[in-house]
């Protein structure tokens, strides 16, 4: 399995495709199959969401997926056991998306050790205060986990600079205020923010929250972005069908998304 940094290095100027799916929805076996399908049909990095009872940054599609997974008794140990097995068959590094409370509940060191031992390569904590990130980064570095920091569109230039300096690797630029979900259009303000951030750092920039169509992908790839995260569009296809049909749909959409990037 590749590291996150090596993916961006190997892609050079090509944009990375980063699908997001919720672990355990519609079931954990399907999640494992979905990881393999995404890896085979164009994903460069894969975000895997840890189901959580109060997902403040997530839109309704991902919230519902998280609730369904929790009702099945899906937990971190079951997810990591599945990941450890699947990791042997895929190249795309997995980034675990989790809220801060589950990390604190288990203990920062214990949590990061556990995900590293399962083969997780990256960690994304949307509600991690930048003021508390230094220790988390130090533990992640110890266990070869790349912590990805988020940058909101409402951030001041001073805060942008602070996050850029603190970020150990790539930076996740949130495309909209509010929660994740499918948005009908992208704003010129977002493009300007992207250009501003790119002038302030050479670190890789990935863009997510609200990207759901191949038209949006084609538009964004021209912004000199290093990676595009697509979440709700994949989760909706996977969870809105019987498992076999959902897997077929994410395979097709993953191919379409990749073609939109490389075309």
Curated annotation (Swiss-Prot):
Superkingdom of origin: Eukaryota
What is catalyzed by this enzyme? (1S,2R)-1-C-(indol-3-yl)glycerol 3-phosphate + L-serine = D-glyceraldehyde 3-phosphate + L-tryptophan + H2O
- The EC number(s) given in the record are 4.2.1.20
- SUPFAM superfamilies according to UniProt: Ribulose-phoshate binding barrel (SSF51366)
Q: Name its cellular compartments.
A: Plastid, Chloroplast
Membrane-spanning intervals of the chain = none
Sorted alphabetically, the keyword list is: Amino-acid biosynthesis, Aromatic amino acid biosynthesis, Chloroplast, Lyase, Plastid, Tryptophan biosynthesis
List GO molecular-function terms, semicolon-separated: tryptophan synthase activity
Q: What Pfam families does its record include?
A: Trp_syntA (PF00290)
Active site (catalytic residues): 47, 58
Q: In which pathway does it act?
A: Amino-acid biosynthesis; L-tryptophan biosynthesis; L-tryptophan from chorismate: step 5/5
GO CC, any one term? chloroplast
Q: Gene3D superfamilies this protein is in?
A: Aldolase class I
Q: Which HAMAP family match?
A: Trp_synth_alpha
Enumerate the PANTHER family for this protein.
TRYPTOPHAN SYNTHASE ALPHA CHAIN, CHLOROPLASTIC, TRYPTOPHAN SYNTHASE, ALPHA CHAIN
Subunit structure of this entry? Tetramer of two alpha and two beta chains.
Q: What does this protein do?
A: The alpha subunit is responsible for the aldol cleavage of indoleglycerol phosphate to indole and glyceraldehyde 3-phosphate.
Tell me its family. Answer: Belongs to the TrpA family.
Would you tell me the protein name for this molecule? Answer: Tryptophan synthase alpha chain
> Gene name, please?
trpA
